[in-house]
């Protein structure tokens, strides 16, 4: 996924178009963070506008209330997916209010932290998307592979400990 998001809707669209021209099809897009008090309707209109300008893209919405000031609800995500089933394909959930509660067929869910990887996999999530995976990738991969192979989890506690060490700096 190519992460896009600027302080201007038009710049966001331009960045997505540029990425699309260079072969990217899947984009991680956070709702606008430059307006306070975003509503479900406003966020719906934001994604609708992007899709109207680049209709062939696939979007993983980015739920990160701390950064964007908006927290997706199950209802808001469901409306986006129902309206744009060929475009809205998943959610990165850094707010952690959706990964356990959102149940949509053929919808990718990625918690935004290693601390939720194993639990997420156990309830049907697809994996994680985490900046800290730049450091924890071998451990996260081991947890993922062991889960897929139904092997005993030997690295999850270590993975969580490394992540929590980073969380201490937030």
What does each of the following model-derived ranges do?
Residues 1-69, 77:
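Active-site beta->alpha loop and helix N-cap motifs at the rims of alpha/beta catalytic domains
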